[in-house]
């Protein structure tokens, strides 16, 4: 072997050596017999370096995985012998191999097993067992091989072909017949031999039993001698976690409901008498997390048994199953309330399913009612934050607690289904007592009290948030709690979690303020002062900006008395912060978007006359326009690229803010009705010069383009005079992405204004197409994926543009471009339909073609178009689906084929018998289609029902493709 190259396998080797080692590995993979050198090195223990041994196994792994069928019988025998002799050597080695080498060796054994077991090596396990016997090193490798085989056969994370899946099923069936009882016996012997002397091997063996129990005969494991041994392991500290997992797999195995019930009950009796049902908070939490998972599995298994027995009408056994479930509830509650969230989380499934049973019962016993209440109290307690929770840097622990809270929320929702009155009463009790003394209560208790009120909104669902009408007792309870929330002063609590929960809840129950509007001023003040938008925490300010926007929007009819006051108070929050002013703004630009939108909503929905609305909107937008002009001048002069970028960002924010205010308008309150057209036209005139700025083009164009999209909706035809010059600037020096983003703007204008923009479209049609073609024809690196994707997206945008033009009744825009240009456009559509393997673009192209045939395909169509139909469009309808890349199993491609069928139907509709004659006598014979199939095709085409032809066309091409 190349010793120099092998040096590069060391993790500390420099990059040149590592590159050489990689190249050597590739070379050995390709070489037909280099693997033999590696096999020999392993069998004869030529190398002591761990990385070289691992490397040799990798080469063998590649050989077995990808090239095994190419080997001769002798070579295949050599690989078997190499592995067995390596295994034998492990019995004698003074030191065991490193874990990563043992795992890799096990993977190679497993690959060889799945390749040879059914054909050449049926005695695989017997051969291995005869080598390893009960030698601890041998047993370790045997167990690793079993786990690797399980991964190959059963692991759902490994994607298998249908062929491999069939093979794996056959292997498992054969193993069940031939060797599983022997394997199970070997596991029993290993467990018995090593349970007190070698915990590592025992735990490995328990893992193997747990893995295999899912697909072998359960009676081999679920019997007295095996179960008693596993239960014995539950009392041995180093084994009990693995024993728990193994028992969980046994309990999880599907079986007859009565047998499952008996199995679970027998396990529980032993565990209970051994004291496992009394949970000690100080107990080892890792073990309790596994134990909780086991109890969850047992509980859910009993519930599945109960469901099956009820379904089968076996009431007697169902009653027994329910009794068995009830006796586990006390244990479930101990685990649910445990201070460690992992332990609690692992039992939630059982708890949830138990509540589902109670929901189905017509009457609950006193004990069941007590259980519901106990679960409710446990959920309320567990929703509470820990004292040491880090709110400033939540990290992974924070994410896990958020996830855990979501699980608890599901329990709360289920509790509401079982006993809504009890839930409401419990929450009300906790909420009221906590808020009476909030000044002296710890933050986590105050937060959870408000949180529970918040969660009731989803737990007790109503349509359109109408919590304060309908059921009187529920409405008055919620109303009381909301009144307490907004009048208690708790919004001043000095903790971010309480502050945020206050605002979230106020917005969640916004309908309360239509019932008791007298509380609006104090809540508005909370939003606007140091409790909300001016809070010391950026996180609170940011979230409040969004919630304030929602609050104002949902209560806009109640806002009229406060509008001017609010606008004055948020004045400083609306300031555009230029990069050079140095001071940190209270809100980020993203947060400011919500404040601008809120200001817009207040103005537009006010009861003021149009003149007042216009004046207020001008006050809001004029500072933006003034700042914009100054910043644009500064950008033109800026030399430093970093400064250019920050100025461009600021300009972009200004445009974005103006754009966001326009979201307040609606069909009822249009820009015109509010008298605000002039203000937005001024904005347009202010922002458009940014398009001619040669610096930071991407960001400036993107902002102005978005603003134009909004103005087309808001200002309608008043925006049209600005479009030609804006388009001209946006077509200068553009890249694929610029064009791709510009085309939707033109599509929007075309679809909205149609004939009104015909002169403009005629004028800019070819310049736009030239810009597109120029970018598409630019050479790119062969393997530049992003460039290829950009071109694909641009091509799609181009075809979408043509589709918009043709479907908006503007085909004369194309027709008036001169014969040569028209032909060029049509040819690109044919290319799009046939040549590019992009079903989305192909579908669009066929839509364009069928539309053009519909418009121009009759007797009075443009000169030469009928020829084009027969020379190009008809062939496209056959050549595209016949391509290998046209995958009829793909949903998008089927849609493209559907439009192809529409195109052919439209040609037949416009050209009549002439079309059928052309297909029968010229085109289809030229494709060597059999006469009877031609006949069949033409009959299908002439069917009045288009769906019949679409279905036929799919079958036609499925038959035609090899």
Swiss-Prot record:
UniProt-listed GO biological process terms: intracellular protein transport; tRNA re-export from nucleus
Write out the annotated subcellular location.
Nucleus; Cytoplasm
Tagged with keyword Nucleus? yes
Alphabetized Gene3D superfamilies for the sequence: Leucine-rich Repeat Variant
GO MF entries = small GTPase binding; tRNA binding
Where is it mainly found? nucleus
Q: What Pfam families does the record point to? A: Exportin-T (PF19282), IBN_N (PF03810), Xpo1 (PF08389)
Mind telling me which SUPFAM superfamilies this protein's record contains? Answer: ARM repeat
Q: Which InterPro entries match?
A: ARM-like, ARM-type_fold, Exportin-1/Importin-b-like, Exportin-T_C, Importin-beta_N, XPOT
Q: Which GO terms describe its cellular component?
A: cytoplasm; nuclear matrix; nuclear pore
Claim: Nucleotide-binding is one of the keywords in the record: no
Please list the residues that carry the modification N-acetylmethionine. Answer: 1
Superkingdom of source = Eukaryota
Keywords annotated in UniProt: Acetylation, Cytoplasm, Nucleus, RNA-binding, Transport, tRNA-binding
Q: Which residues carry this modification: N6-acetyllysine?
A: 634
State how it assembles: Found in a complex with XPOT, Ran and tRNA. Probably found in a complex with nucleoporins. Interacts with Ran and tRNA in a GTP-dependent manner.
**Purpose of the protein:** Mediates the nuclear export of aminoacylated tRNAs. In the nucleus binds to tRNA and to the GTPase Ran in its active GTP-bound form. Docking of this trimeric complex to the nuclear pore complex (NPC) is mediated through binding to nucleoporins. Upon transit of a nuclear export complex into the cytoplasm, disassembling of the complex and hydrolysis of Ran-GTP to Ran-GDP (induced by RANBP1 and RANGAP1, respectively) cause release of the tRNA from the export receptor. XPOT then return to the nuclear compartment and mediate another round of transport.
Matching PANTHER family, A to Z?
EXPORTIN-T, EXPORTIN-T/LOS1
What is the designated name of this protein? Exportin-T
Q: What is the scientific name of the source organism?
A: Pongo abelii (Sumatran orangutan)
**Which gene carries the instructions for this protein?**
XPOT
């Amino acid at each position: 072997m190349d010793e120099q190259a092998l040096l590069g396998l060391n993790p500390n080797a420099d990059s040149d050596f590592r590159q050489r080692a990689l190249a050597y590995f590739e070379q050995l993979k390709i070489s037909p017999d280099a693997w033999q050198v590696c096999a020999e090195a392993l069998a004869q223990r030529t190398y002591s370096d761990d990385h070289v041994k691992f490397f040799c196994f990798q080469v063998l792994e590649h050989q077995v995985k990808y090239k095994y069928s190419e080997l001769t019988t002798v070579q295949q025998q050599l690989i078997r012998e190499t592995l067995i002799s390596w295994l034998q050597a492990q019995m004698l080695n003074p030191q065991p191999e490193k874990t990563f080498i043992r795992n890799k060796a096990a993977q190679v054994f497993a690959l060889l097993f799945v390749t040879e077991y059914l054909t050449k090596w049926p005695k695989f396990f017997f051969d291995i067992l005869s080598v390893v016997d009960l030698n601890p090193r041998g047993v370790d490798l045997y167990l690793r091989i079993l786990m690797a085989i399980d991964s190959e056969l059963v692991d759902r994370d490994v994607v298998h072909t249908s062929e491999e899946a069939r093979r794996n099923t056959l292997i498992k069936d054969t193993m069940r017949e031939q060797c599983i009882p022997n394997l199970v016996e070997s596991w029993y012997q290993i467990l018995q031999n090593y349970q007190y002397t070698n915990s590592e091997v025992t735990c490995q063996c328990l893992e193997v039993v747990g893995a295999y129990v899912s697909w072998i005969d359960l009676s081999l494991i679920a019997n007295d001698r095996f179960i008693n041994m596993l239960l014995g392991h539950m009392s041995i500290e180093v084994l009990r976690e693995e024993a728990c997992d193994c028992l969980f797999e046994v309990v999880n195995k599907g079986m007859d409901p009565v047998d499952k019930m008996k199995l679970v009950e027998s396990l529980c009796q032993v565990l209970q008498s051994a004291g496992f049902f009394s949970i000690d908070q100080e107990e080892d939490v890792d073990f309790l997390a596994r134990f909780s998972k086991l109890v969850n599995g047992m509980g859910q298994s009993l519930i599945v048994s109960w469901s099956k027995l009820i379904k089968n009408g076996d009431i007697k056994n169902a009653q027994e199953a329910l009794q068995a479930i009830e006796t586990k509830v006390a244990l479930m509650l101990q685990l649910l309330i445990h201070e460690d969230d992992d332990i609690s989380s692992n039992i939630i499934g059982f708890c949830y399913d138990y509540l589902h049973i109670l929901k189905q019962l017509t009457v609950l016993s006193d004990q069941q009612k007590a259980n519901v209440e106990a679960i409710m109290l446990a959920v309320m307690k567990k929703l509470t934050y820990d004292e040491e929770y880090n709110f400033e840097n939540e990290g992974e622990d924070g994410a896990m607690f958020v996830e855990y809270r979501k699980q608890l929320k599901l329990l709360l929702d289920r509790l509401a289904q079982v006993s809504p009155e009890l839930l409401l009463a419990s929450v009300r009790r906790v909420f009221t007592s906590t808020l009476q003394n909030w000044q002296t209560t710890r933050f986590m208790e105050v937060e959870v009290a408000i949180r529970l009120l918040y969660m009731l909104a989803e737990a007790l669902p109503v349509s359109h948030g109408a919590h304060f009408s309908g059921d009187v007792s529920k409405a008055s309870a919620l109303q009381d709690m909301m009144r307490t929330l907004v009048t208690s002063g708790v919004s001043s609590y000095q903790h971010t979690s309480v502050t945020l929960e206050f605002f979230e809840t106020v917005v969640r129950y916004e309908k309360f303020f239509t019932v008791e509007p007298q509380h609006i001023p104090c809540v508005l003040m909370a939003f606007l002062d140091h409790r909300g938008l001016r809070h010391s925490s950026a996180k609170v300010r940011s979230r409040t900006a969004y919630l304030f926007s929602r609050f104002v929007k949902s209560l806009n009819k109640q806002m009229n008395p406060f509008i001017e006051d609010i606008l004055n108070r948020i004045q400083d929050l609306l300031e555009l912060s230029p990069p050079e002013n140095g001071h940190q703004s209270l809100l980020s630009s993203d947060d400011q978007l919500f404040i601008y939108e809120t200001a817009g909503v207040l103005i537009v929905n006010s009861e003021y006359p149009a003149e007042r609305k216009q004046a207020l909107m001008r006050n809001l937008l004029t500072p933006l326009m003034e700042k914009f002009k100054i910043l644009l001048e500064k950008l033109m002069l800026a030399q430093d690229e970093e400064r250019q970028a920050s100025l461009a960002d600021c300009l972009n924010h200004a445009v974005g803010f103006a754009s966001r205010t326009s979201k307040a308008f609606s069909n009822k309150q249009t820009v015109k009705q509010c008298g605000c057209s002039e203000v937005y036209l001024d904005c347009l005139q202010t922002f458009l010069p940014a398009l001619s700025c040669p610096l930071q083009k991407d960001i400036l164009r993107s902002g102005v383009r978005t603003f134009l999209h909004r103005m087309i909706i808001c200002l309608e035809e008043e925006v049209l005079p600005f479009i030609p010059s804006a388009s001209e600037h946006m077509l200068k020096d553009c890249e694929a992405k610029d064009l791709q983003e510009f085309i939707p703007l033109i599509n929007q204008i075309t679809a909205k204004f149609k004939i009104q923009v015909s002169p403009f479209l005629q004028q800019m049609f070819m310049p736009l197409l030239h810009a597109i073609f120029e970018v598409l024809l630019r050479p790119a690196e062969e393997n530049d994926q992003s460039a290829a994707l950009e071109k694909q997206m641009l091509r799609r945008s181009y075809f979408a543009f043509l589709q918009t033009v043709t479907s908006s009744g503007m085909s004369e825009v194309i027709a008036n471009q001169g014969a040569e240009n028209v032909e060029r456009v049509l040819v690109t559509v044919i290319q799009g339909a046939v040549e590019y393997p992009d079903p989305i673009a192909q579908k669009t192209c066929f839509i364009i073609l069928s539309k053009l045939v519909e418009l121009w395909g009759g007797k009075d169509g443009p000169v030469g178009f009928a020829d084009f139909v027969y020379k190009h469009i008809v062939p496209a309808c056959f050549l595209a689906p016949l391509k290998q890349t046209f995958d009829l199993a793909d949903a998008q491609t089927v849609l493209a084929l559907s439009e192809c069928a529409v195109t052919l139907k439209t040609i037949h509709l416009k050209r009549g018998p002439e079309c059928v004659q052309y297909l029968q006598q010229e085109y289809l014979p030229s494709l060597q289609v059999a006469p009877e199939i031609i006949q069949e095709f033409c009959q299908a085409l002439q069917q009045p029902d288009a769906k019949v032809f679409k279905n036929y066309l799919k079958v036609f091409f499925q038959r035609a493709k090899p």
